Regions:
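Secretory targeting signals
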Residues: 1-4, 15-22
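N-terminal export leaders
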Residues: 6-10
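Intrinsically disordered, low-complexity acidic regions enriched in Pro/Ser/Thr
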Residues: 11-14, 25
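A general structural signal for well-ordered secondary-structure junctions
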Residues: 19, 33-34, 180
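A surface/extracellular/periplasmic glyco- and lipid-processing/surface-interacting theme
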Residues: 65-111, 118-389
Length: 389
């Protein structure tokens, strides 16, 4: 810290010397005048030293961690050039009969959102959006269509979206925000490029009709080469990363051995169980452990629950039916964040489509997250989140 200069004011009053008045002799007969008395000399006061008023020291600013990091995991990045390539998100169906999946375990972030198809009770299942950047899964499957909430979720990333299409009004909505997302590289629009493929073992026939919705696969690294857009990669961190493990907000949080997030009313719960050995949360679906096609169970470093109002409707011009909507643009709500067996809660806020989420803890301090893979659950704002120690 630079030294603070101090100034000393010295007040000195210099003495004033007055010459003595000499006697004036006046020759008068018979008398002589006595010499006039010299006036008293004024005393010169001694110099006075005045102490200066101390200049208040500015409050110290917290150090800024400027080390380069992978924007979607927060992991330190030795060579920033390695991050200069597009992030690729893929739309993956998540109903029981559409499992097992591939590639989910290699994503930096996975969003869990409403699927949109209603069951007999009027409830919707879920759809996943794994996002790849620090590493690219060779194959991701199955692949399905875009939903409206993908735009505000992925615009802060400048992402390419692997998909099989969308309703006409949703396509128009995607095109409107083309500055921040590339959603036109669908299965049909990239035929012959090797960006997508078909797993013949997943093709099925129902009532004489052949279906490929469970069989479509995406190759993210190949898909990224089909455009020159977003070659510099995400230009901002998606989450507020802590500079060290000691800075992570959950260090002083409450215990969270298990987490349950409902989607269909108070049922259809996605759940997480903390594993002390790996220091990660193992994920389960409503019917059992979330396991990939290769037998690997999903386990993540961070679980982030963002509660937001869910409903169905149309928010842009064009044909097509109502789609599931999550109100996160220019909104706020409650969040829960868990890491290493502990959790904190607070308020999330999000501005416009391309603005990242902001998170504030209940005590008013900003959230600091641990680096690593993150699952983001997006239940309704009225959902009852169960966290047990």
């Amino acid at each position: 810290m630079a030294k603070i200069s101090r100034r000393t004011a010295l007040l000195g009053l210099g003495g004033v010397g007055l010459a003595g008045i000499g006697a004036v002799g006046i020759g008068l007969a018979g008398r002589t005048n006595a010499p006039a008395a010299a006036p008293p000399t004024r005393e010169t006061p001694a110099p006075v030293s005045q102490s200066p008023t101390p200049t208040p020291k500015p409050a110290p600013k917290p150090p800024v961690d400027s080390r380069p990091r992978w924007p979607l995991t927060g992991v330190l990045l030795e060579n920033p050039k390695k991050a200069q390539h597009p992030a690729v998100a893929v739309k993956v169906p998540d109903n029981k009969y559409e499992h097992p999946q591939r590639g989910i375990d290699e994503a930096d972030i996975v969003f869990v959102q409403l699927e949109g198809y209603l069951d007999a009770d009027g409830y919707s299942g879920t759809r996943l959006v794994p996002v790849f950047h620090s590493r690219m899964a060779e194959t991701v499957m199955p692949v399905r269509s875009i939903r409206p909430v993908d735009i505000p979720l992925l615009s802060p990333i400048d992402a390419i979206i692997g998909n099989t299409g969308a309703a006409r009004w949703v396509i128009n909505y995607v095109k409107h925000y083309r500055k921040h997302v590339e959603g036109m590289l669908s299965y049909m629009n990239t035929r012959g490029t090797g960006s997508y493929g078909t797993d013949p073992s997943r093709v099925y026939t129902y009532q004489g009709q052949t279906y490929y919705d469970r069989a479509t696969v995406c190759h993210p690294a190949v898909l990224a080469k089909q455009t020159k857009r977003f070659r510099k990669g995400p230009q901002q961190s998606y989450f507020p990363w802590a500079s060290s493990s000691a800075e992570v907000s959950t260090v002083h949080g409450k215990k969270a051995k298990t987490i349950e997030v409902p989607y269909k009313g108070d049922g259809y719960r996605m759940s997480y169980a903390y594993d002390k050995k790996s220091r990660r949360y193992r994920r389960s679906m409503p019917w059992g452990p979330h396991v990939m096609a290769d037998g690997k169970r999903i386990a993540v470093d961070n679980v982030l629950v963002i509660k937001a109002k869910q409903h169905f409707g149309k928010i842009y011009s064009g044909s097509g039916h109502d789609e599931p909507l999550h109100d996160i643009i220019d909104k706020s709500g409650t969040f829960y964040y868990a890491n290493r067996g502990r959790y904190v809660t607070g308020t999330w806020r999000k501005g416009g489509v391309a603005k990242p989420f902001q998170f504030t803890l209940a005590d008013g301090t900003p959230l600091k997250m641990a680096t690593g893979q993150t699952f983001v659950e997006l239940p309704d704002d009225g959902a009852k989140i169960r966290i047990k120690d």
